[in-house]
Protein backbone atom coordinates (compact mmCIF):
# COMPACT_ATOMS: atom_id res chain seq x y z
CA UNK A 1 0.00 0.00 0.00
CA UNK A 2 1.35 3.42 -0.92
CA UNK A 3 2.25 5.92 1.78
CA UNK A 4 2.54 9.71 1.49
CA UNK A 5 6.12 10.82 0.96
CA UNK A 6 5.62 14.21 2.64
CA UNK A 7 3.38 15.65 5.33
CA UNK A 8 0.36 17.53 3.96
CA UNK A 9 0.48 21.11 5.19
CA UNK A 10 -2.40 22.75 7.05
CA UNK A 11 -2.97 25.16 4.19
CA UNK A 12 -3.35 22.36 1.67
CA UNK A 13 -5.57 20.40 4.04
CA UNK A 14 -7.82 23.39 4.77
CA UNK A 15 -8.05 24.42 1.14
CA UNK A 16 -9.01 20.87 0.16
CA UNK A 17 -11.68 20.70 2.87
CA UNK A 18 -13.07 24.17 2.12
CA UNK A 19 -15.70 22.74 -0.24
CA UNK A 20 -16.49 19.73 1.99
CA UNK A 21 -19.74 20.93 3.57
CA UNK A 22 -23.24 19.70 4.21
CA UNK A 23 -26.13 20.78 2.00
CA UNK A 24 -29.49 21.89 3.32
CA UNK A 25 -32.21 19.26 2.98
CA UNK A 26 -34.47 19.85 -0.01
CA UNK A 27 -38.14 20.08 0.95
CA UNK A 28 -41.45 20.15 -0.89
CA UNK A 29 -44.83 21.38 0.33
CA UNK A 30 -47.49 18.83 1.19
CA UNK A 31 -50.49 19.22 -1.17
CA UNK A 32 -52.85 18.12 1.61
CA UNK A 33 -51.83 20.42 4.50
CA UNK A 34 -49.10 22.66 3.06
CA UNK A 35 -46.39 21.66 5.55
CA UNK A 36 -42.80 21.25 4.33
CA UNK A 37 -41.85 17.59 3.89
CA UNK A 38 -38.97 15.60 2.47
CA UNK A 39 -39.56 14.41 -1.10
CA UNK A 40 -40.79 10.82 -1.58
CA UNK A 41 -41.73 10.58 2.13
CA UNK A 42 -45.05 10.72 3.99
CA UNK A 43 -45.93 14.07 5.55
CA UNK A 44 -45.00 14.11 9.26
CA UNK A 45 -47.89 16.41 10.20
CA UNK A 46 -50.85 14.85 8.36
CA UNK A 47 -49.40 11.45 7.35
CA UNK A 48 -50.48 11.60 3.71
CA UNK A 49 -48.42 10.67 0.66
CA UNK A 50 -49.63 10.68 -2.95
CA UNK A 51 -53.29 10.87 -1.99
CA UNK A 52 -53.23 8.16 0.69
CA UNK A 53 -53.09 8.51 4.46
CA UNK A 54 -50.34 6.46 6.10
CA UNK A 55 -50.57 7.91 9.61
CA UNK A 56 -52.12 4.77 11.14
CA UNK A 57 -49.37 2.55 9.69
CA UNK A 58 -46.62 4.79 11.07
CA UNK A 59 -48.06 4.97 14.59
CA UNK A 60 -48.94 1.28 14.97
CA UNK A 61 -47.41 -0.60 17.92
CA UNK A 62 -45.82 -3.96 17.14
CA UNK A 63 -46.16 -6.63 19.82
CA UNK A 64 -44.61 -10.09 19.94
UniProtKB/Swiss-Prot annotation:
Record GO cellular component, one term: large ribosomal subunit
GO biological process, one term: translation
Disordered: annotated segments: 1-20
SUPFAM superfamilies: Zn-binding ribosomal proteins (SSF57829)
KW Ribonucleoprotein (keyword) present: yes
Keywords in alphabetical order: Ribonucleoprotein, Ribosomal protein
UniProt xrefs under InterPro entries: Ribosomal_bL32 (IPR002677), Ribosomal_bL32_bact (IPR044957), Ribosomal_zn-bd (IPR011332)
Gene Ontology molecular function: any one: structural constituent of ribosome
Family: Belongs to the bacterial ribosomal protein bL32 family.
Alphabetized PANTHER family for the sequence: 50S RIBOSOMAL PROTEIN L32 (PTHR35534), LARGE RIBOSOMAL SUBUNIT PROTEIN BL32 (PTHR35534:SF1)
NCBIfam families, per the entry: rpmF_bact (TIGR01031)
Record-given protein name: Large ribosomal subunit protein bL32
Species the sequence originates in: Bifidobacterium adolescentis (strain ATCC 15703 / DSM 20083 / NCTC 11814 / E194a)
Amino acid sequence: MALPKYKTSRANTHSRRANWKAKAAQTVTCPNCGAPTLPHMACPSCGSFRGRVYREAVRSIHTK
